[in-house]
């Protein structure tokens, strides 16, 4: 759906930029990067190319900002509640993450599948995984986690992305079932690594 030029002109600068980033995310995750140009993007959004260049100096800068905005939205949506026990923190973050995936299924699928060929996407996903792993380890361990725990958590994050891709493709299990499956696999991986956290102490 295109947004008309007048509606953009009525917006303040921050709101206009936010909407441009949202539309940019839709376009960059639904089409190959090389197929898009600033002219095509401006036409799809429904604004002039000059206005688009007013906010972003070029396609690469626009692309990178849309990725950064997506990562920030993910961080905010999945921020755990530190007042909850560790397992409840993980459940809450997983619920928020799966809701975001469900709401943006096509974009998520395209983002994951584009990672192999687009360095910026690959780097962003790696950054998000590292930050998520750190969150999980800080929630589960009161002291420096053992190396096996770090390895298990990082491996689990790759599993989670694969499971989410399968879920949005088939939609044959409930979101809560997937959340519990992911949580069970994480705990199982830590147990298998002989690095199961003391949840009573962590809480």
What function would you assign to each model-found segment?
Residues 61-70, 124, 128, 132:
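Alpha-helical DNA-contacting segments of helix-turn-helix folds
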Residues 1-15, 194-203:
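N-terminal intrinsically disordered/low-complexity leader segments
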Residues 119-158, 177-188:
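Amphipathic alpha-helical packing segments from all-alpha helical-bundle domains
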Residues 79-106, 142-146, 152, 156, ...:
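Hydrophobic alpha-helical connector segments
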Residues 19, 23, 27-61, 65:
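Helix-turn-helix
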Residues 110, 138, 157-174, 187-199:
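Amphipathic C-terminal alpha-helical segment
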Residues 100-126, 137, 162-169:
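Amphipathic alpha-helical segments used for helix-helix packing
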